[in-house]
């Protein structure tokens, strides 16, 4: 139907089977290879300022559609227009597009959007293919305004840096009534200065990494450019680069009557929001352009003193850049220590046994006591304690009940369950080692569940009253999702709710009649725009009940959504007080209700901005600002004693869904976790004040490594936290949620998906995950239906309640292959830590796109093997059904027109009700961000009067937008 309406081609799973990924790409490119005939506007029509006419004219000029006489008329008309032109060029990867965007932002801010600005971004054409990647637009955040026009062009010739018809294109833009034209040219070599004749003022952008100072003699643009920017000024050697370039410009201009520091050379960090180096550069360019006739306006930006960026913020201090390599070394040191201690324990036992046998045989014992004493003294305190207490541990686990005495209270936990055949199945099985060396190694590397290094699990026993099942829902408006959550949890005493949000909410926008927003409202997730929506979403659930926990899958605008949730919980408990007492609480009582709510509320918010940059795409604010607010959330949690709610769910799930293999998923996720630890420590927090608020979220899958993913994660985390960071036992416990693989769900033979999900759920439960979400079989093509969700939940229930071996809670321990896999995966993760460390840690690796590139490579490897059949997937590339699958009408979960309209009306009602308080709340929020105060503390107030979209727009102004990469 869509193809009949003009969509060229939709590719189906069947196309993927027959064509493969490369085949679909080739088909798409072939269909776009021949340009359609476009309308050629008249030259004089350009003076109307119509942007559509301008874009068509530029295309016509590129395609030589105008006659020589028409082009001559264009030149004559444009000659009467004195629009100044700024040319920006520089080396490839210097940050020209980011610099251009920040300069445009300064023009907009300084002129209060009174200038009409055109941007012409030129990218090089490749000699071999004749194609060009027009990728500059994706880096632009400041162009979304009626007064900004941007057009990307290819050079259409691999041997030049500017298009053949650049002069005519600039003439066409001049006629369209712009006040300023900015031309950005491709990255160039040392001998190119082709842009200079076409512009009035030229800016050359470079980085500090140009080699020896003598290389500067070879750069033509240092002769011809008017202004110079050394971008990425936060890198090592920047000050030296500034000195060398300034001296070179001084020599080139023979300006020996002036000092090098007066040359127009600026140190900038275009990637940093509101960088004062960029502002200084802009103010220099503004002066140059005014000399060439730039429209006058009253500048509002304060003059910047100096020429370089001074607001350098290091999230991870330079002295801690090797943290991942140090963690890898700490884990390996622990293994070496374990090997040494187990050897000593074995030899001590062997010597003691030898002594006993010799004594029984009446032989001499000379020297044995000394050898035994030497090994005994070499055993550390922990090893001795573990061996000494082992008999008592065996006795504790051998009875029918495990008894713990806390003060005067006894807590009894059943240790056996009788099967139908009368067999007593142990809840925790212990090794039968007689050798002290093997026993000590097991205690130091495995141990019973709930004991360091927590390889088998972070808790002694699973809760009898609460399965690790999460009830996942999100569709339509808050009322519909609330109804679904109640349906899912009606048979469970524990309400473990998980919420998905629609893409409008995920990107921090409000519902809007604008078609591209309106169509997404309430689809593939619930629409939440205000505190009213959040209250309706969880209405009827006691958010402070110990058996209720809420997980929210949201990242970019997570701070705002979290503030809404906490306010909803406080409002709920306040209403309970009113209902119980028949009156509103006094101010002191209200403060007590708030404090108690924050202490009791239980759940997690995803809020992992590092994973979003590496594997997904819902980053909306600058990375620096997002990390700052994440730290603010944790500081707020620490200050208010929020101990049962996780401030972040450090997520590998989306990294895996993007294509990473299980080792990369685990390594990247743990590395991100340790990065948060380092960032919070750098803010002055104490590790034991925040580590318990960190949780993890992993994918499961069919690969063998997934069987040990949790054990490896727990062991690495606990060892690093104990020995590298000196954390206490609670901080050493890594708690994680598992969601079965979405990538393993296939549209072909969908009913087989439940089989895959069952196997993945089984290994997750065997590995003692702390909570589990099983995907529905139809999620390959739609949001799950009530029927498919019920089947998905039944998978967990059948394993937990019917599967016999699930009675045992450490069934992975003692398996040779599990032990081998654990060691192999652990070492692979440590090696990945070292590779990331070589790139400057997680943040340094993100700058070069290391994680994203590796994920893409691994995804392609999977797709190729799936297509060629070397990776068998039943029902997809093997065991194919000879009979075509029967056609059936699948229920698609979609929001209704009534729900969309209701959301718009509720949003308007909220805004009208809070119109008199909104401006003040947003201004306080802005001030908190500008003054480096705790933004989340102010956000807790702002969400009471402001919508999600209003807060997002405010954060864009004070924190900057995320700048996307290709």
Where are the predicted features?
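Catalytic alpha/beta active-site cores
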Residues: 1, 399-700, 705-706, 724, ...
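Canonical P-loop GTPase G-domain recognition
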Residues: 3-33, 219, 223-296
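Extreme N-terminal, non-catalytic leader segments
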Residues: 21-84
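Flexible, glycine-rich loop/tail regions that form catalytic "lids" or insertion modules at the edges
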Residues: 38, 292-506, 786, 790-797, ...
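Nucleotide-state-sensitive switch-loop elements of NTP-binding domains
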Residues: 61-83, 94, 99, 103-191, ...
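Hydrophobic anchor at the beta1->P-loop junction of P-loop NTPases
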Residues: 86-88
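ATP-binding Walker
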Residues: 91-94, 946
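Conserved Switch II/interswitch segment of TRAFAC-class P-loop GTPases
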Residues: 176-179, 185-189, 198-216, 225-240
């Amino acid at each position: 139907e869509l193809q009949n309406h003009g969509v060229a081609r939709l590719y189906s799973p069947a196309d993927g089977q027959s064509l493969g990924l490369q085949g679909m790409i080739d088909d798409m490119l072939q269909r776009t290879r021949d340009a359609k005939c476009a309308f050629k506007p008249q030259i004089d029509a350009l003076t109307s300022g119509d942007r559509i006419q301008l874009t068509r004219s530029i295309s016509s000029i590129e395609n030589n559609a105008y006659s020589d006489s028409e082009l001559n008329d264009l030149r004559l008309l444009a000659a009467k227009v004195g629009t100044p032109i700024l040319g920006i060029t520089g080396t490839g990867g210097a940050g020209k597009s980011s610099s251009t965007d920040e300069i445009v932002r300064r023009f907009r801010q300084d002129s209060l959007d009174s200038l009409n600005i055109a941007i012409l971004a030129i990218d090089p054409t490749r000699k071999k293919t004749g194609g060009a990647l027009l990728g500059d637009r994706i880096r632009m955040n400041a162009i979304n305004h009626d007064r900004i026009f941007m057009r990307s062009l290819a050079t259409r010739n691999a041997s030049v840096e500017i298009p053949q018809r650049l002069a005519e294109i600039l003439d066409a833009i001049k006629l369209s009534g712009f006040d300023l034209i900015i031309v950005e040219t491709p990255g160039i070599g040392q001998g190119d200065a082709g842009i200079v004749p076409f512009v009035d003022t030229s800016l050359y952008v470079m980085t500090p990494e140009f080699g020896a100072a003598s290389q500067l003699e070879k750069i033509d643009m240092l002769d011809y450019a008017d202004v110079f920017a050394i971008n990425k000024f936060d890198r090592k050697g920047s000050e030296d680069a500034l000195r060398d370039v300034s001296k070179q410009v001084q020599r080139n201009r023979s300006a020996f009557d002036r000092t090098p520091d007066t040359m127009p050379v600026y140190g900038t960090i275009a990637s940093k929001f509101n960088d004062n180096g960029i502002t200084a550069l802009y103010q220099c360019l503004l002066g140059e352009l005014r000399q060439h006739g730039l429209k006058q306006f009253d500048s509002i930006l304060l003059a910047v003193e100096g020429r370089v960026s001074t607001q350098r913020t290091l999230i991870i201090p330079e002295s801690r850049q090797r943290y991942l390599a140090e963690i890898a070394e700490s884990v390996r040191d622990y293994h070496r220590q374990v090997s040494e201690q187990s050897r000593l324990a074995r030899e001590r036992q062997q010597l003691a046994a030898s002594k006993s046998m010799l004594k029984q045989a009446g032989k001499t014992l000379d020297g044995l006591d000394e050898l035994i004493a030497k090994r005994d003294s070499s055993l550390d305190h922990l090893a001795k304690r573990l061996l000494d207490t082992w008999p008592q541990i065996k006795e504790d686990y051998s009875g029918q009940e495990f008894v713990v005495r806390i003060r005067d209270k006894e807590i009894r936990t059943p240790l056996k369950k009788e099967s139908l055949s009368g067999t007593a199945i142990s809840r925790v099985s212990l090794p039968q080692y007689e050798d002290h060396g093997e026993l000590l190694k097991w205690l130091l590397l495995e141990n019973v569940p709930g004991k360091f290094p927590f390889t088998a699990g972070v808790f002694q026993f699973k809760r009898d009253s609460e399965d690790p099942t999460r009830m996942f829902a999100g569709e339509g408006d808050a009322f519909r999702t609330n109804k679904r959550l109640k349906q899912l949890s009606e048979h469970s005493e524990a309400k473990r709710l998980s919420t998905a949000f629609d893409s409008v909410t995920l990107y921090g926008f409000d519902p809007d009649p604008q078609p591209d927003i309106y169509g997404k409202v309430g689809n593939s997730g619930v629409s939440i725009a205000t505190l009213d929506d959040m209250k309706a979403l969880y209405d009827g659930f006691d958010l402070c009940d110990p058996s209720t926990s809420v997980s929210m899958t949201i990242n970019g605008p997570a701070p705002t959504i979290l503030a809404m949730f906490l306010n909803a919980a406080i409002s709920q408990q306040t209403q309970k007080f009113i209902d119980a007492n028949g009156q509103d609480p006094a101010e002191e009582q209200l403060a007590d209700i708030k404090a108690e709510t924050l202490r009791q509320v239980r759940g997690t918010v995803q809020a992992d901005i590092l994973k979003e940059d590496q594997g997904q795409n819902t980053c909306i604010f600058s990375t620096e600002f997002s990390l700052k607010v994440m730290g603010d959330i944790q500081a707020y949690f620490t200050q208010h004693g929020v101990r049962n709610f996780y401030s972040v769910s450090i997520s590998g799930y989306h990294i895996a869904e993007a294509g990473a293999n299980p080792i990369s998923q685990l390594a990247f996720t743990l590395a991100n976790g340790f990065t948060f630890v380092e960032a919070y420590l750098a803010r002055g927090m104490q590790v034991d004040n925040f580590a318990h608020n960190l949780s993890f979220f992993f994918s499961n899958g069919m690969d063998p490594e997934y069987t040990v993913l949790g054990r490896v994660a727990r062991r690495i985390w606990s060892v690093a936290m104990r020995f590298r960071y000196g954390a206490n036992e609670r901080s050493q416990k890594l708690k994680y949620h598992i969601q079965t693989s979405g990538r393993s769900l296939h549209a072909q033979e969908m009913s087989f998906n439940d089989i895959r999900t069952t196997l993945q759920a089984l290994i997750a439960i065997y590995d003692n995950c702390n909570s589990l979400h099983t995907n529905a079989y139809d999620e390959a093509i739609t949001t799950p239906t009530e029927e498919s969700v019920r089947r998905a939940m039944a998978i967990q229930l059948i394993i937990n309640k019917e599967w016999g071996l699930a009675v045992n809670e450490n069934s992975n321990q003692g398996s040779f292959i599990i032990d081998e896999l654990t060691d192999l995966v652990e070492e692979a993760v440590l090696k990945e830590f070292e590779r990331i460390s070589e790139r400057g840690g997680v943040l340094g690796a993100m700058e070069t796109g290391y994680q994203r590139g590796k994920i893409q490579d691994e995804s392609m490897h999977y797709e190729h093997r799936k297509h060629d059949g070397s990776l068998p997937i039943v029902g997809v590339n093997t065991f194919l059904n000879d009979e075509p699958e029967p056609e059936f009408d699948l229920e698609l979960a979609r929001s209704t027109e009534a729900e969309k309209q209701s959301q718009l009306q509720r949003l308007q009602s909220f805004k009208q009700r809070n119109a008199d308080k909104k401006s003040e709340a947003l201004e306080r929020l802005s001030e908190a961000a500008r003054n480096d105060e705790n933004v989340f503390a102010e956000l807790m107030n702002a969400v009471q009067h402001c919508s999600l979209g209003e807060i997002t727009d405010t954060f864009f102004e004070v924190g900057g937008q995320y700048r996307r990469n290709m």
